[in-house]
Amino acid sequence: TGQTTCYNSTGGTIACAGTGQDGQYQAGIDPVVAPTCCGTTNAYNTPAWTGVRFTDNGDGTVTDNLTALIWLKNANCYGPPNWATALSNANTLANGSCGLSDGSTAGQWRLPNVNELHSLIDLTQSNPALPAGHPFTGVRSSFYWTSTPVADSTSYAWFVFLYNGVVGDDDETMTYYVWPVRGGQ
């Protein structure tokens, strides 16, 4: 998650040792990316995040240097459709739409899974809960669909609330925003 600080229940900074928070483990660093972006290692032998989190590729995409995922720069290209339409919109995204000039074709983009979308969240921020200085445009402090269906339901899927980073689930007929991604899985 890129978190290196730990917090108590009132939001105050605390020592990370023994908390079990992300700041203690500093997990989520891709070892392939680590040599070019990261500095020292922690007690768990994972690199501590010290690099530039996002790269604006200048073609309508943004690379997350922490996860190596490529995101659509425009986080509000489609407005808020239902879940089935959100899946379709992401899958049919291609060069020439939504500000893209990257040469991508339909089928290369997809709706992110719940872990991928939540990896963008910075819990020290709100409205939206994204890292300060992020390069994205059109971000709504609202609900965004993920591709992850709820395991014990045939009509519910997971979302991330960009206002504060909360993850929840809702009926697939609800209309939430779409933020396509490519790479990873």
Residue ranges and their predicted role:
Residues 1-110, 114-185:
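Glycine-aromatic-enriched surface loops/turns that form tight recognition elements
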